[in-house]
Amino acid sequence: METIVLMKNDNDGSPFLPLAADNFKKACVVGPFIENPDTMFGDYSPTMMTDYIVTPLAGIKTTQIGSDLLNYEEGCTDGPACEIYNSNKVRTVCEGVDLVIVTAGLSRYLEHEGHDISKISLPGHQMSLLTDAESASGSAPIILLLFNANPLDISYAKSNPRFAAILEAYYPGQEAGVAIANVLTGSYNPAGRLPNTWPASLDQVPDMINYTMKERTYRYFTQEPLYPFGYGLSFTTFKYSDLNVASTANTNGEGSITVSVTVTNTGTMDGDEVTQAYVKWDNVAEAPNIQLVGVSRKSISKGQSITVSFTIKPEQLQVWTDDDKWSIPEGTYSLFVGGQQPDQKVSVPSNVLSATFKL
């Protein structure tokens, strides 16, 4: 459950999840992942014991979602590749429901060691799966569950108000259905964060023959992504205050920078917060645009304030120079501490504090 990322939670300006399950007594669950145990596991997974695997559909069946009517249909008879797709079956099960849950994504057969994906669009007819479920279900809200490792172009769901929630589950393993059910119903408050930058389009991704670091990873990315590295929502809210920075570090690699900040759970639920510390070099040409230098995940009860601390070592501030050697630049550094990267258009509803220090 700890890796699940809540990417969208917006129902006409209000949070949609967690579900008040008894409000959605008629539901449908569609897509190639609902009852396909193999798709719950990524590359290099151990041998599966299928008797112990809880699929997403099995997990949802343990809740009150669709207590009067729970329709389901994979739609794609060839799994996530979804080259063989039955639109009529998907549309039929989505008619007249109060809630739609769509599963989409990749699999270890579409992305694995020695087989990178060549595009970030949903494979096969999965985009038709989304639009069929949407058009057949009237005005019912839609939850998109994603199962993948590589970033995908889900801009349609991100910008579409019918898609009230998006959850990134990755390849969650044998208890997948239990984890998903717990998040949907609020038994667990998600706090996963994206470990990579999700480009808005393939045009933002450099060609593989370009060996520079320009636009590669969050450290050198200068464009507006679909979702930034380190992003992830919560069912509660957090506020940062009282940032303190003290430095004994120098450019010889001695000493350290100590950082402390107060984090307050200002919402109505207990939850984990992932505090992130980033550094920017001022006027250092060889340096990345920004770099993560500290991360801490802490459970914080509603109304509680805690102190989160980091120790930054000088070697974390090294850059590779034009002289082909590592060097710790002398000068001013900017530090940002919060639940996300600073200055991101797609952001979580918490503040980011900043300070400077010198070496």
Language model region names:
Residues 97:
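An anion/phosphate-binding loop that grips the pyrophosphate of nucleotide cofactors and donors
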Residues 67-68, 136-142, 161-164:
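A short helix->loop->beta-strand "cap" motif at the edges of active sites that frequently abuts
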Residues 268-287, 292:
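Short acidic, flexible loop segments centered on an aromatic residue
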Residues 1-43, 48-55, 61-63, 147-272, ...:
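Secreted, periplasmic, or luminal enzymes acting at the cell surface/secretory milieu
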Residues 284-320:
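Intrinsically disordered, low-complexity Pro/Gly/Ser/Thr-rich segments with frequent PxxP/GP/PP motifs
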Residues 316-332:
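Short glycine/proline/serine/threonine-rich loop/turn segments at secondary-structure transition edges
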Residues 38-39, 104-123:
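Glycine/threonine-rich flexible loop motifs
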